[in-house]
Regions:
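Bacterial N-terminal signal peptides that target proteins for export
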Residues: 2-12
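Bacterial signal peptide processing site
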Residues: 26-28
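N-terminal, intrinsically disordered, polar/charged segments of Gram-positive cell-envelope systems
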Residues: 30-79
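C-terminal motif of bacterial Sec signal peptides marking the signal peptidase cleavage site
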Residues: 21-24
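ATP/adenylate-binding site constellation spanning eukaryotic-like Ser/Thr protein kinases
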Residues: 15
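Long, non-catalytic protein-protein interaction scaffolds
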Residues: 62-761
Length: 761
């Protein structure tokens, strides 16, 4: 099992390079090739080569990239926009940090604005002196508010990567939401309607044959998808009962059960199980009826599998592909939906039309007529035999019993499969069954959020995990080293497969150790842990924004003259993060433009966000070289809050409701990362904290402040998956305790954040 998992992830990583090579990627441009499962045969050949190279006596050898192989031709559905081109490197990769050290007096007497700390408790002052910085959790609703307060209070700003990453999240979410409202939702509804009509014609043609049950299943499948978006849609009498039962389970969204539609006419002992709690609308979908309907329909099309091991389900998959191919305009609509969603979130982890189409054409010598299928048993046998050769997905998102062969139980066709993501693939290899049962009988059923930064090379994250006792699982360390090696040797194209992948890549510099020459506070263990919170906070926003698509393991700028008081601020010295974020803004604009989805206003705002991050990168590089920013650059730092507020206003304004306040639309959010089939879901959440940092500007030490992510991890019952609204209520709520006093319901942050957090009252 371990070798299979290793081979599977390598296959997907190598696919990125192969697809990028076929696309002829040009720097700064969107490629014309979508990373798709359509080349799985070639991927398997490549991964087998990699496996042979790694199956050597030297167990410590890193996986090697195979020699170039001639890729298999891709079907038309795979040649769609989707891969980002090679992103430009905007930051100075040769920069050697040389920030001069400075000493802070124990009474802060050489800090020019020490009076700002007069009300601080001694414990907070001590931690600030020890680490050079302090984070106070739960101090705001939005990231820009603190910066605007600082501007009017003549307090030096500390510009964090957290605040800039959060601003990209706001625009990513806004763009995706607008695309779903205006294009994807209507397109999916029309596609479902077309597919239902075609499936009905197939059932009429196959009545009385051994294909009749499969045709009923296909009709029921698309009827459910249609009804989830249009509750008034007609339900054919032939499938009324299973469709009604399925819709009731989806509406209740409170259990795991056998799917009435997918198991139609099948063996109850081998029933396909579905986790219906996944249909609780979450992220930004909750609260808007049209988006909630789109959420449920896409969840249905993304999660349900026509299993390859089930012959009758494979008939249904063939009929679905045949309907997609032959119904007027259906294939083009599907390709458009797949291309746009893949640009945001990545390619399907499971086999889809792009995989099945060439198999069907090869077995049948072209596209067969539905009515002729019962008379072609040899072709069907060739088709099912070829399906057995398709690689399963890297991530299991289905309830599977432990005695089942996971690959056999999950491999098959998904109409609009949920997407492969590196984080989910990492988590899959670090939970039971890939990680063995501990001596005390416990099983690692859910991953830790820290598994991801640890797998990406963070020794700080790995040390925390071991301190928590994760190494009690016999082969957890071995699995972690395997995943680390895979990711360390992953080709560059892995990180440009989608906006999701590029966002994750933008966060990686936060995990790099900061040694001599970096600002003193960045050299501390406490800062390494704070950077983990920055990484995880932005990653939580990424998971939140792609909750539907990513596959889960199981204003006013201010004015007035500048006062003579020295309020010059500082930019967090992470030029690589700011540079990568600028490149990501550029790739977002170019990709949307290539897809015909970029308005003039959005192009302008993405351009502004690109320029802002490029300027912050330049300032951070100057700081690391020991150079003084210009007066114009200090003014940029000073006015930073107004710029953030502009982007916030652009993304949360509503034509009907008007413009919200930060209290109505806070930055805090919550997202699922994994589900334990025994009834628990692990969620990650964010909040907004204030960071205070002692920095030196032009020879004087000052206390600068800014905003950072608060990070939370918690487990809840699957039937109670939290929405953002639930999370906001939890963060701001109070409940009466047994002592009769009211206490905050805000959960505790992980214990490792104690190293850098404190309270001011």
């Amino acid at each position: 099992m371990k070798r299979m998992k290793k081979r599977r992830l390598l296959s997907l990583l190598l696919a990125a390079v192969m697809a990028a090579g076929l696309a002829g990627c040009v720097p700064g441009q969107i490629a014309n090739l979508l990373l798709s499962a359509g080349s799985r045969t070639a991927q398997d050949k490549l991964s087998e080569t990699a496996e042979q190279k790694t199956d050597q006596p030297d167990e410590t050898a890193q996986p090697s990239a195979p020699q170039a192989a001639e890729p298999a031709p891709l079907p038309a559905a795979a040649t769609l926009p989707g891969l980002l081109g090679e992103l430009p490197v905007l930051y100075d990769e040769t920069l050697t940090p040389s920030v001069p050290a400075f000493t802070v007096e124990s009474d802060f007497s050489n800090v020019i604005n020490a009076g700002d700390m007069d009300y601080w408790p001694q414990e907070a002052r001590d931690k600030l002196l020890q680490n050079g910085f302090l984070v106070v959790p739960g101090t705001g609703d939005e990231f820009f508010s603190r910066y605007e307060m600082n501007r009017y209070g003549y307090i030096p700003n500390f510009i964090t990567v957290d605040s800039s990453l959060h601003t990209y999240h706001l625009y990513f979410l806004y763009l995706q939401k607008q695309t779903e409202r205006n294009e994807l939702g209507p397109a999916l509804l029309e596609l479902s309607r077309t597919m239902q009509q075609t499936a009905q014609a197939q059932l009429d043609a196959l009545a009385g044959t051994e294909w009749e049950n499969a045709a009923r299943r296909t009709l029921a499948f698309f009827t459910v998808g249609l009804c989830l978006q249009d509750p008034a849609a007609a339900v054919p009498e032939a499938v009324a009962e299973p469709v009604a039962a399925e819709l009731a389970l989806i509406e209740a969204a409170d259990t795991t059960a056998a799917s009435p539609v997918m198991n139609l006419g099948g063996d109850p002992a081998a029933a396909l199980m579905e986790d219906y709690t996944q249909y609780i609308p979450r992220s930004y979908y909750a609260g808007e009826e049209s988006l909630e309907r789109y959420f449920r329909a896409m969840m249905w099309y993304g999660r349900l599998t026509f299993r390859a091991a089930d012959e009758d389900a494979s008939r249904s998959a063939l009929l679905a592909c045949l309907a997609l191919q032959t119904a007027g305009g259906a294939r083009e609509t599907w390709e458009r939906l797949y291309a746009v969603t893949s640009f945001f979130a990545g390619a399907s982890d499971d086999a889809c039309f792009a995989d099945y189409a060439p198999v069907i054409e090869q077995a049948y010598g072209g596209w067969p007529e539905a009515a002729a299928l019962p008379q072609q048993p040899d072709a069907f046998a060739a088709y099912t035999a070829a399906l057995a050769e398709l690689a399963p997905g890297a991530v299991n998102s289905m309830p599977v019993f432990e005695w089942e062969d996971r690959d056999a139980a999950t491999a098959g066709f998904r109409f609009m499969g949920q997407r492969f993501t590196l984080d989910a693939a990492v988590f899959q290899q670090l939970i039971y069954r890939d990680v063995e049962q501990a001596a005390d009988g416990s099983r690692r059923m859910l991953p830790e959020a820290l598994d991801l930064p640890a797998a990406l090379g963070s020794d700080t994250a790995l040390a925390i995990l071991n301190e928590q006792g994760e190494d009690k699982y016999p082969n957890y360390g071995e699995q972690m080293e395997t995943v680390r090696a895979q990711l360390d040797s992953a080709p560059a194209a892995t990180w440009t497969a989608s906006l999701y992948a590029a966002w994750l890549d933008t966060l990686r510099p936060l995990l790099q150790p900061k040694g001599e020459g970096w600002p003193q506070y960045m050299q501390t263990e406490a800062w390494a842990k704070r950077s983990l919170a920055s990484f995880l906070g932005s990653w939580a926003e990424l998971k939140h924004d792609t909750a539907l698509y990513a596959k889960q393991v199981y204003g006013e700028m201010g004015g007035g003259p500048i006062d003579a008081e020295d309020d010059r601020g500082y930019v967090e010295a992470e030029p690589a993060v700011f540079g990568k974020l600028a490149a990501l803004c550029q790739a977002t604009a170019e990709g949307l433009d290539a897809l015909g989805l970029l308005s003039e206003a959005d192009a302008e705002n993405l351009g502004r966000l690109y320029t802002l991050n490029e300027q912050l990168m330049t300032i951070a590089e100057k700081e690391l070289r020991g150079e003084l920013p210009t007066d114009e650059e200090f003014e940029l730092i000073r006015s930073y809050g107004g710029q953030l507020e502009h982007f916030w206003t652009q993304t949360v304004q509503d034509e009907e409701a008007g413009i919200y306040t930060p209290q109505q639309m806070p930055a805090a959010l919550v997202a699922d990362i994994a589900t334990d089939p025994n009834g628990t879901v692990r969620q990650v959440g964010t909040g907004v904290g204030t960071i205070y940092v002692l920095v030196e500007v032009d020879g004087s030490i000052r206390l600068a402040s800014g905003t950072v992510f608060d990070f939370y991890q918690l487990d809840v019952p699957s039937s109670e998956r939290m929405t953002d609204q639930d999370w906001w209520a939890l963060l701001s709520g109070y409940e009466q305790g047994e002592d009769g006093q009211y206490h905050s319901t805000r959960p505790d942050q992980p214990a490792w954040t104690d190293a850098y957090t404190g309270a001011l009252y």
